[in-house]
From Swiss-Prot:
Name recorded for this polypeptide: Catalase-peroxidase
PROSITE patterns for the chain: PEROXIDASE_1 (PS00435), PEROXIDASE_2 (PS00436), PEROXIDASE_4 (PS50873)
CDD domains hit by this protein: catalase_peroxidase_1 (cd00649), catalase_peroxidase_2 (cd08200)
Organism classification: Bacteria, Bacillati, Bacillota, Bacilli, Bacillales
Covalent link (Tryptophyl-tyrosyl-methioninium (Trp-Tyr) (with M-249)) residue numbers: 100-223
Task of the protein: Bifunctional enzyme with both catalase and broad-spectrum peroxidase activity.
Changes after translation: Formation of the three residue Trp-Tyr-Met cross-link is important for the catalase, but not the peroxidase activity of the enzyme.
Location in chain, cross-link Tryptophyl-tyrosyl-methioninium (Tyr-Met) (with W-100): 223-249
Source species of the chain: Geobacillus kaustophilus (strain HTA426)
Binding, heme b: 264
Length: 736
């Protein structure tokens, strides 16, 4: 039998499917590279998930022997394995880097990235140059994952291992919240950059303006280039990159200094020899490597011979102990530029004292000089960073506390509100970056809900105003980092009340009516609940006017946040620059309106059919920004009909482009202009997949189905941030 790797193997006559990207089959993308990508709306469905459908991770986590798990992790830290020995006999620094790099891909611009789904296990993250040799860290964790199984996700385990690592070396932490649920394949919705080569940097324009929503400076890096911008060893220029990158992760200067200094208090960088000795990353490794990458032929290929970043050495003389020696060395010595054995820029101390030599990674009796990266020296030579770093140097307890808080924020920022946290170590303290919301202490009976709906419908507010306000409040939700949503009613507060898309004057009028209703009620009901209930009442009325007597499921329990609980700068990133559901776009972008609609739908957690039915329903309900007529293909505005779809696919009309990206819908016989539309509207007739959904909802026998599906999708958005209730309860079936 011939070796399967030989090039002269016979061609299989029965292999008709496309099973690799290297297939010689031509795909739709090859023919039509600009084709709309709807696949990001259908990720992580049941077909990829090996768990039973009834599996509930939160319930499994509650069965976990949490303290036994932490003890097993603590023991692992010093149980060095021959196949990948621990530097200094302690795996702590490796696990800190693993946890940091899991959480550190998060960016505030779109809330994507981060450690909440365990995607460091998959491409591209598992093969990023900045994640080199973290595959070894995950393999070291496997016996513990195997032991505790479904009770602890990979996502939670990686972060918890980082916490235990810090604690095992004398560092301070302030707690841990579980609840990160694994996905089972890569997140294809995340834009990591346009570069086609690792460590390429094509994401800047103008005066080093970083492309949105990216945070990292180069393809395949978590943060910044440790050698300096584009590999140039300039600490001051590096500080500029650091500040912008960490800002885009939601970190201020103090948190940035604490994280860099705290992380570099531990461990070492690895650059024992030239990178030419290092094999391919995990995704490119041969099958016999079994998912391990970066296998090195330099020396033993491990221990003191390891090659990772190319920079070589520890930062401190005590690399497995929490102390203040990082700042002491940073400020007490002058630093001279040099190169590592791998040829990377780094800095060495001038006139180093013997007591400040670091131990060798394998033999504590052998001493080697410590080093600093260009990005470390940025903390000394940038004026603002220097003030903070020197204060931490002079106040070690303040530094320890600042690091613990910044670490908790780093590892939990993408988890959403505190109500999602699980486990016995959840801190009691609320942090403003968690977007805290007061809990409510009232319940509403069905009769009370009906009375309130009647008050709202008799208040003088229109169906359009009620629907618009509810949508504006709820559609801020981002499933990426679980921020936004109707809970908290932050639409009353800065900055949301002043966003252009929310039509501030009209919004103020609607909120004033809700406040009047709230005062008149015999019991306290939150504005957040009233806004959602008002939208639901309007949808019910619109459905009744269309001939369908329906109840829109409503679950009270939302609280009203205060301005003091709302970080204006942090919430500003949630402002929509486009919302196709309201036919709104702030200005022209390089990306088409239809693509921005799909991105918005993905952030809301919607499927393609849900996106379709919501757009069609919101158009006829009059939810467009400033009542623009585009896409309102009906003569019965405010009535929940399928008219949008009926008229969209009607061949009696033709679609003619005009100026400003607007299209006219004309009668083919008379030339009469019936309606106008945007690309967002027309894509549901132009894209073959979306047209199939549009035709489905345009069918005569699917009018009722359209109403039911619209309500289910509407309720899904209204309850997207209700982590205190079960999703299946929120999506109870609609009876018509």
């Amino acid at each position: 039998m011939k070796n399967q790797n030989q090039h002269n193997t016979s061609k299989c006559p029965y292999h008709g499917s496309v099973t690799s990207y290297n297939s010689n089959r031509t795909t739709n993308k090859d023919w039509w590279p600009n084709q709309l990508n709807l696949s990001i709306l259908h990720q992580h469905d049941r077909k990829t998930n090996p768990h039973d459908e009834e599996f509930n991770y939160a319930e499994e986590f509650q069965k976990l022997d949490y303290w036994a798990l932490k003890e097993d992790l603590r023991k692992l830290m010093t149980e060095s394995q021959d196949w990948w020995p621990a530097d200094y006999g302690h795996y702590g620094p490796l696990f800190i880097r693993m946890a940091w790099h899991s959480a550190g891909t998060y960016r505030i611009g779109d809330g994507r990235g981060g450690g909440s789904t365990g995607t460091q296990r998959f491409a591209p993250l598992n093969s990023w140059p900045d994640n080199a040799n973290l595959d070894k860290a995950r393999r070291l964790l496997w016996p513990i994952k195997k032991k505790y199984g479904n009770k602890i996700s990979w996502a939670d385990l990686m972060i918890l291992a980082g916490n235990v690592a810090i604690e095992s070396m004398g560092g301070k932490t302030i707690g841990f919240g579980g609840g990160r649920e694994d996905v089972w394949h890569p997140e294809e919705d995340i834009y990591w950059g346009a570069e086609k080569e690792w460590l390429a940097s094509e994401r800047y324009s103008g005066d080093r303006e970083l492309e949105n929503p990216l945070a990292a400076v180069q393809m395949g890096l978590i943060y910044v280039n440790p050698e300096g911008p584009d590999g140039k060893p300039d600490p001051v220029a590096a500080a500029r990159d650091i500040r912008e990158t960490f800002r885009r992760m939601g970190m201020n200067d103090e948190e940035t200094v604490a994280l860099i200094a705290g992380g570099h208090t531990f461990g070492k960088a690895h650059g024992a020899g030239p990178a030419s000795h290092v094999g391919p990353e995990p995704e490119a490794a041969p099958i016999e490597a079994q998912g391990l990458g970066w296998i090195s032929s330099y020396g033993k290929g491990k221990g003191r011979d390891t090659i990772t970043s190319g920079i070589e050495g520890a930062w401190t003389p005590t690399p497995t102990q929490w102390d203040n020696s990082y700042f002491r060395l940073l400020f007490e010595y002058e630093w001279k530029l040099t190169k590592s054995p791998a040829g990377a820029y780094q800095w060495e101390a001038v006139n180093l004292r013997e007591e400040d030599l670091a131990p060798d990674a394998e033999d504590p009796n052998v001493k080697v000089p410590p080093m600093m990266m260009t990005t470390d020296l940025a903390l000394r030579f940038d004026p603002e960073y220097e003030k903070i770093a020197r204060r931490f140097y002079e106040n070690p307890e303040e530094f320890a506390d600042a690091f613990a808080r910044a670490w908790f924020k780093l590892t939990h920022r993408d988890m959403g509100p505190k109500t999602r946290y699980l486990g016995p170590e959840v801190p009691k303290e609320d942090f403003i970056w968690q977007d805290p919301i007061p809990t409510v202490d009232y319940e509403l009976s069905d009769a009370e809900i009906e009375e309130i709906k009647a008050k709202i419908l008799n208040s003088g507010l229109t169906v359009s105003e009620l629907v618009k306000t509810a949508w504006a409040s709820a559609s801020t939700f981002r499933n990426s980092d679980k921020r936004g949503g109707a809970n908290g009613a932050r639409i009353r507060l800065a900055p949301q009340k002043d966003w252009e898309v929310n039509e501030p004057e009209r919004l103020a009028k609607v909120l004033s009516v809700y406040e009047d209703i709230q005062r008149e009620l015999p019991k306290k009901v939150s504005i957040a609940d009233l806004i959602v209930l008002g939208g639901s009442a309007a949808v019910e009325k619109a459905a009744r006017d269309a001939g369908f007597d329906v109840k829109v499921p409503f679950i009270p329990g939302r609280g009203d946040a205060t301005q003091e609980q709302t970080d204006v700068e942090s919430f500003s990133v949630l402002e929509p620059f486009a919302d196709g559901f309201r036919n709104y776009q702030k200005k022209e972008y390089s990306v088409g309106p239809e693509e921005l609609l799909i991105d918005k739908a993905q952030l809301l957690g919607l499927t393609a059919p849900e996106m379709t039915v919501l757009v069609g329903g919101l158009r006829v309900l009059g939810a467009n920004y400033r009542d623009l007529p585009h896409g309102v293909f009906t003569d019965r505005i405010g009535v929940l009909t399928n008219d949008f779809f009926v008229n969209l696919v009607d061949m009696n009309y033709e679609w003619v482009p005009t100026e400003g990206g607007i299209y006219e819908i004309r009668d083919r016989q008379t030339g009469e202009v019936r309606w106008t539309a945007t690309r967002v509207d027309l894509i549901f007739g132009a894209n073959s997949i979306l047209r199939s959904y549009a035709e489905f909802y345009a069918q005569d026998d699917n009018r009722e189905k359209f109403v039911r599906d619209f309500i289910n999708a509407w309720v899904k958005v209204m309850n997207a941030d209700r982590f205190d209730i079960h999703l299946k309860q929120a999506k109870e079936s609609v009876t018509v």
